[in-house]
Amino acid sequence: MNTRPLVLPELLPLLEEVPTVDLSPDALPGFRRGLEYAAGQSFLQAEDYPVILERLTIPATDTAPDLRLLTVRPRKDATSPRPVLLHLHGGGYFAGQPELTATQLCQFAQDLDCVVISPDYRLTPKHPFPAAIEDAYTTLCWITRNADTLGIDASRIGLTGESAGGGLAAGLALLTRDREGPPLLFQNLVYPVLDDRTTTGQPDASPVGGEFIWTRASNTFMWTALLNPITPGSADVSPYAAPARATDLSDLPPTYLSVGALDLFLDEDLAYAQRLIHQGVSVELEIVPGACHIFDQTDTPVATRSIARRIDAMKRGFGL
């Protein structure tokens, strides 16, 4: 179905700036180079914000290498320990880095008066599941152990992520609940990747999702690399990799979920939000008409409004 007429006019330039590509092993190097360039540009722009950006390292263990972190904190002095926002970047699990959305992280740190910490987690296809989520959990535990040094309040940890990072955040919320790890005040999920079964073809799937930016072919490539050697859609996929597989969603933190109406992930995100509600989790859901994947990575009114709502939800989550 031709969905271009459904795209908000202000987002049409995005379709020219980010050409839609069906990802494959051959296309992956070029995709990574594009995100590396975008990350560099975003990091340069971040220097205009009244924040301090710092790169830290969690030392290697017997089972994992050094883990690099990007931290962002307001430049102004704190009068008390700040809340902390754990951010997980997007990029299909096989590309990206914390600097990819550095300007947004600066805005979060500034508007929420919090410390933002984003790990440079291991990527597929070299490091399939569970490498990324274990890196995310390692970061969460490191935050609580180093709260005094970081000047943060370990009882006020929020979680956010976009796209693959949103799926990783949802998986981390499940994992830390089941491991009785550090408590989370909220999960703020932006067009999260949640369900590997979308690769198998579903007759009731939205006919308007996935034409632009992130396609069904790219989605299949992503899930295949993440779950290797397990086949996407098979019975033994972990809910920590595909949170939609979880049967028990109770006792998860209050959730804010945002997705565009033209995003490939619309159906799985709506289904997840509904199941959270049915199991007693507080949920706010934003569906953005005329918006495709990564719409919020643009300098447009619709992106500004969506990010403002996201920040407002996190303020309430932190009790601000």
Segments and roles (model prediction):
Residues 99-119:
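Short amphipathic alpha-helix adjacent to the substrate-entry channel of hydrolases
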Residues 144-159, 179:
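Gly/Ser-rich "nucleophile elbow"/oxyanion-hole loop immediately N-terminal to the catalytic nucleophile
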Residues 127-149, 310:
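Alpha/beta-hydrolase active-site loop
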Residues 1-74, 232-233, 301, 305, ...:
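A glycine/proline-hinged amphipathic helix-loop "lid/cap" segment
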Residues 161, 165, 169:
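Gly/Ala-rich beta-loop-alpha elbow adjacent to hydrolase catalytic centers
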Residues 154-156, 170-320:
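Alpha/beta hydrolase fold serine-hydrolase catalytic domain that processes acyl esters and thioesters
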Residues 61, 69-81, 244-249:
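Short beta-strand-to-loop junctions in surface cap/lid or active-site-entrance loops
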Residues 81-91:
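Short beta-strand element of the alpha/beta-hydrolase
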